[in-house]
Amino acid sequence: MARRRMGEEGKGGGWGLNGRQCRFGNRLRAVKGEGWRSAVAAQAATGRREEDDAGGREKGEKRERKGGLSPCLFGKRRRERRRGGRGRREALPPSLGGLRAERRGRGDDDVLINYNVQHVSRIKLEERLLITDKLSLRFLDPIFFGEYPREMREILSSNLPKFTPEEKKLLQNKVDFIGINQYTAIYAKDCIYSPCALNTYEGNALVYTTGVRNGAKIGKPTAFSTYFVVPESIESAVMYVNGRYKDTTIYITENGYSQHSDTNMEDLINDVERVNYLQGYLKYLSSAVRKGANVGGYFMWSLIDNFEWVFGYTIKFGLYHVDFDTQERIPKMSAKWYRDFLTGSNVTDDTQVWSRRADS
């Protein structure tokens, strides 16, 4: 899918839709079943693009719109990881160890990104191509194409290091799969044609991001202050990465819902919101697979409540409630729903889940 510049419609402060992600999580293996459950776990066999890397980039250049640069250039970096060149075998963490056999003997060279995707909101719906997330692509583009994204080169110019031919050869096509941590979406404002405070982390990108516009949140809030429930964002992220990087296998390495730890015990255990969150995101992930995205698997964050690097013990992502004083672990409603989802046994639908209790 080609990158597209912000057009004349974007002048005056156009807003976009941006999918944000965080941290690396545990793998909960998906079991193939019928319907969209199997679509989530299975790799798509159709919709493969036949463009080579150079051809795809050339077409992307030709699809530029008149006007300024892409409104969103970089996002926040929480974590990026990349293994060495093929042949240097490193032990995978337990959560990914099972993937080695799936690679049919190839080295497990991979990269994990916290991926932000954007839609331009002022062009026709059918033209809502995803705008490049410059932070994630500043790692992926050199690996796949041997150079930084065009927007980075245009804005940062001589401040960017130059890759030698030897470095380009060393970098290119050394990845077997891409891991995406995907949780939410945010609005992104173009700061090339609109006044913005640029003393933020994203300031060099000439972009301003927020989860609220004109007093309205982009989605239902969660305990994680910058994460909102926007299920369609996972499909957007997967489809963009799949198209840009020539159908490299994609794993959703994190996706999950957070609760406040001071929530009463009954609501913590009967976590209806988490069940609805998982249903929504898996539905859109299934849609991406059906459209041809090469999705190899899905990892839910997280199996149990844990210490979060930013919020400590004040928020809970787990399918299992943990009493941190006694270490007792209690399955939540979401744990039982997810078990049924993986095994294909009587998954509760949207109308039933609101009345279902965790002790059922």
Curated annotation (Swiss-Prot):
Disulfide bond among keywords: yes
Organism: Oryza sativa subsp. japonica
Glycan attachment residues as annotated in the record: N346
TM ranges: none
Region described as Disordered: 1-21, 35-103
Entry protein name: Putative beta-glucosidase 15
Superkingdom of source: Eukaryota
Keyword Hydrolase: yes
Compositional bias annotation for Basic and acidic residues: 1-11, 47-67
One example of a Gene Ontology biological process annotation: carbohydrate metabolic process
Record-annotated active site: E254
Family, as annotated: Belongs to the glycosyl hydrolase 1 family.
Gene giving rise to this polypeptide: BGLU15
